[in-house]
């Protein structure tokens, strides 16, 4: 499998804000991640993040997050630093 890099917007609902889901997908699927921007409050978390890894593993990681209740949207524009 070839490697891919995906830019994503992740929205975590209140019940998942304190869960280590990014760590979990990194370990479980061998994903390298780069958090480009984050805003976390007591009630919601938003991450602009890059996932890099084998294509099938990145897709599995995205599916895992969605099943846990994270809203996952692909980013089609550059992230302003």
PLM regions: where:
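Long, contiguous binding/interaction regions
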Residues: 1-46, 50-81
């Amino acid at each position: 499998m070839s490697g891919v890099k995906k830019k994503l917007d992740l929205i975590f609902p209140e019940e998942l804000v304190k869960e280590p889901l990014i760590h979990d997908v990194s370990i479980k699927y061998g994903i390298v991640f780069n958090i480009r921007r984050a805003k976390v409050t007591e009630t919601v978390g938003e991450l602009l993040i890059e996932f890099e890894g084998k294509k099938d593993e990145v897709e599995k990681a995205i599916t895992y997050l969605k099943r846990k209740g994270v809203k996952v949207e692909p980013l089609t524009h550059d992230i302003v630093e």
